[in-house]
Amino acid sequence: MKEQITICGAGLVGSLLAVYLIERGFSVRVFEKRKDPRKNEADAGRSINLAISHRGIHALKDAQTGLEKEALKLAVPMYGRAIHDLHGHVSFQAYGEASQHINSIGRGALNKLLITTAENLGVHFLFEHTCTDYHAAGEQWLFSDITGNTVATQSKEIVIGADGAFSIVRSFLSKQQQPQPQIETLEYGYKELEIASAHTETITNNQALHIWPRERFMLIALPNEDGSYTATLFLPLKGEISFEALQSDQDIQLFFKKYFPDTENLFPDLTEQFYRHPTSKLFTIHSSNWFNAHTLLIGDAAHALVPFYGQGMNAGFEDCRILAEIIDGKSKTNWSEIFAEFYNQRKENADAISDLALQNFIEMRDHVADASFLLRKKIEKHLHQELEDAFIPQYTMVSFTDISYKEAMETGLLHQKILDEIMAIPDIEAAWPTEELKNKVITVTKKYI
């Protein structure tokens, strides 16, 4: 008889995990509090498009042959950042080599694909079922539907919480374990705005992440498959320039005219959208308790992070791949060992990408239009071209390889030290890129690697 596993959450991570587990011979059922998203639109306030890069694609490919190809049919490639200055001038910054790109993909479309894929393999989905209780003594979970009918798991059945940043499974586990999860809230919020395809004629590069960096805040826009864009305004919640300060039609219109003048034609219904779309908060979840003997947290339920590196979904998908690899490496399914090994592998990497995401917010918001920053990027590119694998830029490690997040973070700190020394070379900003300087930066770098 097949061992049954229950997953709480049919979002992106939960539905992909279901594919991995049923492919390994388990009987899998998934409880989800929402209605079936194949019959309903995406939840208001949730990001409706995301960035999928190498780690996420690798996880899709390993889950089922060809799944990554089906997903990428729904995606738009983004080869770099299109930076919009205060005067409406646009400059392009490539993410890496000419062929390297991340992909903008609709959350809803990808979620539907993954649910259908899992369902076709035999996964049983129970929508409109909420996790309502946990009986610690018998290690039994209860799920209730909208009519009040209750479904109980078997005693000590394996339950995996993939129910996101506001995880109910995590909240029940935290009542049994110490220390409590810590929520690190940013002073920023975000609001999504839609740019209809009919209003995009002024956007000249439709294969880029568009950024309007304004130091303390920024606007970004990701392309969608239908030619539209999803824009997101990141702004302090309170203060002189903040969501709190934008209270009237005039406030909103003057703010966009002053700071994002080239977006005037993109949002003909700006104020209506601004009021209609919710302002959401940004936060990071720090938890050291991801599991007990028969329960595991995965994805955002274990390690929610801010969206500024585009790695939330990728990290969650990588969780699924790593968990499956650990299961495959065991001759006998000892869940306590599997969960402990998963935690030991993923916790330090989750902490690393959480820190990197916060750092990337500062980079996107403050530095992408700075001349010194741009020179550092040019020198970084030169070092990678000359030294190849001996000097891989941090962004490349995170977005285009399977190098662990922890290693990427630690190597990035070393690179920062190298580049600080290089930038201290007299007159480098004025003289770059002479052959003498190109050779000198190689010499400096080789002292460290």
Swiss-Prot record:
UniProt cross-references to InterPro entries, sorted A to Z: FAD-bd, FAD/NAD-bd_sf, Kynurenine_monooxygenase
SUPFAM superfamilies recorded: FAD/NAD(P)-binding domain
Annotated EC: 1.14.13.9
Cofactor: FAD
Pfam families: FAD_binding_3 (PF01494)
Swiss-Prot/TrEMBL catalytic activity: L-kynurenine + NADPH + O2 + H(+) = 3-hydroxy-L-kynurenine + NADP(+) + H2O
An example molecular function term from Gene Ontology annotations: kynurenine 3-monooxygenase activity
Any one biological process term the GO annotation gives: quinolinate biosynthetic process
Pathway named in the protein's UniProt entry: Cofactor biosynthesis; NAD(+) biosynthesis; quinolinate from L-kynurenine: step 1/3
Domain of life: Bacteria
Enzyme category, top tier: oxidoreductase
Keywords, ordered alphabetically: FAD, Flavoprotein, Monooxygenase, NADP, Oxidoreductase, Pyridine nucleotide biosynthesis
Keyword hit for Metal-binding: no
Protein purpose: Catalyzes the hydroxylation of L-kynurenine (L-Kyn) to form 3-hydroxy-L-kynurenine (L-3OHKyn). Required for synthesis of quinolinic acid.
Similarity comment: Belongs to the aromatic-ring hydroxylase family. KMO subfamily.
Protein known as: Kynurenine 3-monooxygenase
Taxonomic path: Bacteria, Pseudomonadati, Bacteroidota, Cytophagia, Cytophagales
Gene label: kmo
